Curated annotation (Swiss-Prot):
Gene responsible for this protein: OPG045
Gene3D superfamilies referenced in this protein's UniProt entry, alphabetically: Blc2-like
Cystine crosslinks: none
Any single Gene Ontology cellular-component annotation: membrane
Effect of V100F: No effect on the binding to host BCL2L11
Organism: Vaccinia virus (strain Ankara) (VACV)
Function: Plays a role in evading host innate immune response by inhibiting host inflammasome activation. Interacts with and inhibits NLR-mediated interleukin-1 beta/IL1B production in infected cells. At the host mitochondria outer membrane, interacts with the BH3 domain of host BAK and prevents BAK from binding active BAX. In turn, host apoptosis is inhibited.
Organism placement in taxonomy: Viruses, Varidnaviria, Bamfordvirae, Nucleocytoviricota, Pokkesviricetes
Induction line: Expressed in the early phase of the viral replicative cycle.
Annotated consequence of substituting V100A: Complete loss of binding to host BCL2L11
Official protein name in the record: Apoptosis regulator OPG045
Consequence when changing I125A: Complete loss of binding to host BCL2L11
UniProt cross-references to Pfam families, sorted A to Z: M11L (PF11099)
Length: 222
């Protein structure tokens, strides 16, 4: 599944990406947007599920709104608590993975459609990703994998399975190669003891991936 997607020259292209991207939140704010009435809203949890099937009363809509608000506030609070170093990794992952998703949107959509018709477990995905990363040491593969897995969780899996997948995949993706790439990209931090630099970077890298991909859940609250 993923191996076909990686064949679309992404590995060669992503290594050369250098582009400043404005803050995601400011880009997504539309002050002129008029919110429709609840009965006219279409909630899309994934490619095959219409959330309207589960929201039949005004109470359901209000509860969904409250649940979304509380989850978003918790996520914002988590970001505020993260160390500066972790935030810098999140920024890097956001910039590069958003670039991949935008430039290869068509290729990714094809793979998402294929994946949505398959039956697979979290461990199936992890095993396939692990094989791909063992055979390909480039940064592009890792960034493309993060982008793909994030969107896959949004489209094809329920929140519980998504959390499990993100937890497992973040450890798989944050191998020594990924830590080396992130170290080269990010500015040096002289406050980290040399003896624990690699372990620290790997831990922070996992945290950054978990946070970046965890944002997917705000689209899947159910």
């Amino acid at each position: 599944m993923l191996s076909m997607f990686m064949c679309n020259n992404i590995v060669d292209y992503v290594d050369g990406i250098v582009q400043d991207i404005e803050d995601e939140a400011s880009n997504n704010v539309d002050h002129d947007y008029v919110y429709p009435l609840p009965e006219n809203m279409v909630y899309r949890f994934d490619k095959s599920t219409n959330i309207l099937d589960y929201l039949s009363t005004e109470r359901d809509h209000v509860m969904m709104a409250v649940r979304y608000y509380m989850s978003k506030q918790r996520l914002d609070d988590l970001y505020r608590q993260l160390p500066t170093k972790t935030r810098s990794y999140i920024d890097i992952i956001n910039i590069y993975c958003d670039k991949v998703s935008n430039d290869y949107n068509r290729d990714m959509n094809i793979m998402y459609d294929m994946a949505s018709t398959k039956s697979f477990t979290v461990y199936d995905i992890n095993n396939e990703v692990n094989t791909i990363l063992m055979d390909n040491k480039g940064l592009g593969v890792r960034l493309a994998t993060i982008s793909f897995i994030t969107e896959l969780g949004r489209r094809c899996m329920n929140p519980v399975k998504t959390i499990k997948m993100f937890t497992l995949l973040s450890h798989t993706i944050c191998d020594d190669c990924f830590v080396d790439y992130i170290t080269d990209i990010s500015p040096p931090d002289n406050t980290i003891p040399n003896t624990s630099t690699r372990e620290y970077l790997k831990l922070i890298g996992i945290t950054a991936i978990m946070f970046a991909t965890y944002k997917t859940l705000k689209y899947m609250i159910g």
